[in-house]
């Protein structure tokens, strides 16, 4: 299972239903507004990376979204590869 956290900025006059639009996207498991350098975060989950990319693009092109940064969560398989690697 692939997972990502999408951080984003909204246009100054963003629609009040933007979070509802995010939450209606299949694969979005959480979304909320933030204070700080980003205006919102979305947590998304999908079986394949390509589906996760599709979710990120849907969020990026939602009306009122000015920019996004997608952070892929390191899954257990990748973490095990990192742990097994010897850094010489």
PLM features per residue range, with description:
Residues 1-88:
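A compositional/biophysical signature of low hydrophobicity enriched in polar/charged and small residues
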């Amino acid at each position: 299972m692939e997972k990502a956290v999408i951080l984003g900025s909204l246009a100054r006059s963003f629609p009040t239903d933007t979070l509802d639009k995010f939450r209606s996207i299949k694969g979005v498991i959480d979304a909320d507004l933030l204070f700080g350098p980003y205006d919102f975060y979305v947590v998304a989950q999908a079986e394949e990376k390509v589906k996760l990319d599709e979710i990120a693009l849907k969020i990026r092109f939602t009306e009122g979204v000015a920019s996004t940064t997608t952070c892929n969560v390191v899954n257990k398989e990748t973490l095990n590869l990192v742990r097994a690697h010897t850094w010489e």
